[in-house]
């Protein structure tokens, strides 16, 4: 699963059209998933982070550092204005951390 996430992020960093397609589809799916999660599993929605230990912050930090390493030579980020660059980087970083930590927790998968 991790390898496929790296491939998707690599495409997103080098192809602007793919970035917008994936960005829109990811957030649409995330909103639908979140609404379903709240409606059917309301007791779990407040317990997403209960399974995380204190080293969760170290894990998030490592994911962010690894993501920044992946995005260092990105064509998409080089050709952007400064404000748009920060927005894209923050969005990609959020998706990366979300898929690495929150989704496995919701599905009951331990890293």
From Swiss-Prot:
Task: Tell me, in one coarse class, where this protein mainly resides.
Answer: membrane
Q: How does it sit in the membrane?
A: Single-pass membrane protein
Q: Which GO terms describe its cellular component?
A: membrane
Q: Provide the transmembrane region boundaries.
A: 18-41
Localization annotation: Membrane
Q: Which UniProt keywords apply?
A: Membrane, Transmembrane, Transmembrane helix
Name of the protein in its database record? Uncharacterized protein YHR130C
Q: What is the lineage of its organism?
A: Eukaryota, Fungi, Dikarya, Ascomycota, Saccharomycotina
């Amino acid at each position: 699963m991790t390898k496929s996430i790296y491939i998707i992020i690599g495409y997103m960093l080098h192809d602007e059209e793919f970035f917008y397609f994936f960005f829109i589809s990811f957030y649409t799916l995330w909103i639908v998933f979140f609404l379903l999660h709240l409606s059917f599993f309301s007791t779990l929605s407040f317990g997403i982070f209960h399974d995380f230990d204190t080293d969760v912050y170290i894990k998030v930090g490592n994911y962010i550092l690894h993501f920044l390493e992946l995005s260092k030579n990105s064509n998409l980020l080089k050709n952007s204005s400064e404000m748009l660059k920060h927005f894209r980087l923050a969005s990609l970083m959020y998706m990366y951390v979300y898929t690495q930590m929150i989704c496995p927790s919701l599905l009951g998968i331990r890293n």
